[in-house]
Design a protein with these regions (language model features):
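Hydrophobic ligand-binding cavity/cleft-lining segments
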Residues: 1-47
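Glycine-rich portal/gate segments that line the openings of hydrophobic small-molecule binding cavities
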Residues: 29-33, 40-84, 90, 139-143, ...
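Beta-strand/loop substructures that line and gate deep hydrophobic ligand-binding cavities in soluble
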Residues: 82-135, 142, 152
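Intrinsic-disorder/low-complexity, polar/charged segments enriched in Ser/Thr/Lys/Arg/Asp/Glu/Gln
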Residues: 5-13, 54, 63, 76, ...
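A short, structured loop/turn motif at beta-sheet edges
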Residues: 15-19, 69-74, 94-104
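A generic alpha-helix structural signal
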Residues: 22-25, 126, 137
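Short acidic, gly/pro-rich beta-turn/loop elements at beta-sheet edges
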Residues: 20-22, 33, 67, 89, ...
Length: 153
């Protein structure tokens, strides 16, 4: 047993209405602003956030399998994720109106280490979580300010 589990939560400001902001946190939506994010779908799907949708990513030398567990259209999406032999858990993004024409996305990672190496990876992720979310906010803002950027959808 590794005995390492974290529940990490933080906020990301998005200068879009909630329904549009949530699209940036879908598998294909993240491709627009996350460098190196290339989800692969074993079964083609027009709706990449339909519950039961499975996709894989390869980042930082690791393959992770993701499954859309639940979604509340235009408001929330929840993914289960497993990096074999390393970490497993859920990621939930809930978007609310910030009353200024934009949105606030609450990003919650509930992760458990599956190995000693996974425990080290997870501790490092937890230590840098606030900076990680700040980098997301910057990347989203840069994406949305680019001349060729279109709102998601």
């Amino acid at each position: 047993m590794t005995g390492v589990q974290y529940s990490l939560s933080g906020l990301v400001a998005v200068p879009l209405p909630p329904a549009e902001a949530l699209l940036l946190f879908t598998p294909r939506g993240e491709e627009r602003w996350v460098r190196g994010w290339r989800p692969r779908f074993p079964m083609p799907s027009d709706d990449d956030c339909a519950p039961g949708t499975v996709f894989e990513t390869d980042t930082h030398g690791e393959r992770t399998t993701w499954i859309v567990v639940d979604r509340q259209e235009g408001r929330r999406v929840c993914y289960a994720r497993v990096t074999p032999g390393s970490r497993a858990g859920t990621v939930t993004v809930t978007v609310t109106d910030d009353t200024r024409g934009g949105s606030t996305a609450e990003v919650v990672y509930d992760l458990t280490a599956l190995s000693p190496q996974g425990a080290r990876e997870l501790r490092g992720f937890a230590d840098g979580y606030a900076d990680h979310l700040r980098s997301w906010q910057v990347a989203i803002a840069e994406h949305l300010s680019a001349p060729e950027a279109m709102t998601p959808g």
